[in-house]
Amino acid sequence: MTRPTIPPGPPGAEGRTQTLERTETKKPRLWRVLLLNDDYTPMDYVVQVLEQFFRKTEQEAELIMLAVHHKGQGVAGVYTRDVAETKVAQVTAHAQREGHPLRVVAEPESEGE
C-alpha cells in the first residue's frame, strides 16, 4: 500500500507548522409564521391550511387552530426568512382565492429562544 504524498509547502518552510484558518458560518435567524384570528375564517379551513402548507398532522393542526381562536394567534412553523415569507405569500394567496380573510404574518424569533 502506498502512502499519499503531501505536497511541500513554500520554499524555506521546512520544519514549520502551517496553520489553516477556519471561518465559522453563522446560522441564519429564524422567523415564526403566525396565523391571526378573525371572526370569519372557518376553523376547518385553518386546520386544512396547517395540514396542506405546514405539513401538520390533524391533531397538531387542531391544537394550533385552537390557539389562534382562543389566544388571537398561533405559530404555524419556524423557518428561515425566505421560507417564512414564501409560506406567508402562499397561504395569503390561497385564502384570498377561497374567499377567506385569514391573515398570516412572519416575525423574527427572539435571539434568546
From Swiss-Prot:
Role played: Involved in the modulation of the specificity of the ClpAP-mediated ATP-dependent protein degradation.
Gene3D superfamilies linked to this entry: 3.30.1390.10
Chain intervals for the UniProt region annotation (Disordered): 1-24, 92-113
Protein name (Swiss-Prot/TrEMBL): ATP-dependent Clp protease adapter protein ClpS
Compositional bias per record (Pro residues), positions renumbered to this chain: 1-11
InterPro entries given in the database record: ClpS, ClpS_core, Ribosomal_bL12_C/ClpS-like
Any one Gene Ontology BP term: protein catabolic process
Parts of the chain that traverse the membrane: none
Organism superkingdom: Bacteria
One family name in Pfam for this protein: ClpS
Subunit structure: Binds to the N-terminal domain of the chaperone ClpA.
UniProt similarity note: Belongs to the ClpS family.
